[in-house]
Design a protein with these regions (language model features):
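Short catalytic micro-motifs in class I SAM-dependent methyltransferases
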Residues: 107-111
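Conserved beta-strand signature within the Rossmann-like core of class I S-adenosyl-L-methionine
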Residues: 128-135
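C-terminal alpha-helical "lid/dimerization" subdomain adjacent to the S-adenosyl-L-methionine
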Residues: 58, 135-195
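Class I SAM-dependent methyltransferase Rossmann-like catalytic core
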Residues: 5-31
Length: 214
């Protein structure tokens, strides 16, 4: 068993998962709804890729009348889905070119061994832009910090944890290869309350909007 896994099990015995569910999860949902929603164009038709139960997208729609969002995921959640969801194979999006104004990824790409495959697909189906919420691994002990957060937040749902965290320069190289321009970027999300953000925040999380080059 890895040192990381031992540490994660130890803190779980102290109720960290319960704290995550009761305090952090609700705050994260509210903050991400605001940060992500602001980057989506007015009256956009959006595809949420890897949408889970679609809760964040449904909250964006509630606060931004005129936006329409549907989702795709590799499995459909047993619990309630808040938006229409279609199951797909994780690599081939089942829509024609330019079917949507915007493609959306919220904490999805670091779970994929080769995110470029699905990013190419997102660029194919989106006419205007791609909005991404994900992680930067640039900071001191960034990888370990992100692994811990990922495990606490996702392991209990059976999510495959690839721990595939890129540094900002790697993200920018990927976007350039896809012919995308970063038009908006925010790495001060403040997902965590108070001093906790000094440890788990510190620019490890970002939201960006990528526009298609003409």
């Amino acid at each position: 068993m890895s040192l990381f896994k031992k540490a994660a099990d130890a803190v779980d015995a102290g109720g960290i998962k319960g704290i995550y569910e009761n305090v952090y999860f609700d705050r994260r949902t509210r903050v991400l709804t605001n940060c992500v929603g602001k980057m989506i164009p007015e009256n956009a038709k959006v595809l949420d890729i890897g949408c889970g139960n679609g809760q964040i997208s449904s909250m964006i729609v509630a606060g931004r009348p005129g936006i329409d969002i549907k989702g795709v995921d590799i499995m459909k959640r047993k619990e309630k889905c808040f938006i229409p969801v279609e199951v797909f194979d994780g690599e081939h999006i089942p829509y024609e070119d330019n079917s949507f104004d915007t493609a959306l990824f919220v904490d999805v790409l670091h779970h994929i061994p080769d995110p470029m495959i699905i990013l190419h697909e997102a660029a194919r189906v989106a006419r205007k832009c791609i909005v991404i919420k994900d992680h930067n691994a640039d900071r001191f002990l960034g990888d370990i910090t992100l692994q811990f957060m990922d495990w606490v937040g996702n392991a209990r749902y059976g999510v495959v944890l690839e721990y595939n965290y890129l540094k900002r320069a790697q993200w920018e190289a990927a976007f350039s290869e896809l012919g995308l321009t970063v038009s908006e970027y925010n790495n001060s999300l403040h997902l965590y309350p108070g001093p906790v953000d000094w440890i788990f925040g510190r620019s490890l999380q970002f939201v960006c909007r990528l526009d298609m080059r003409n």
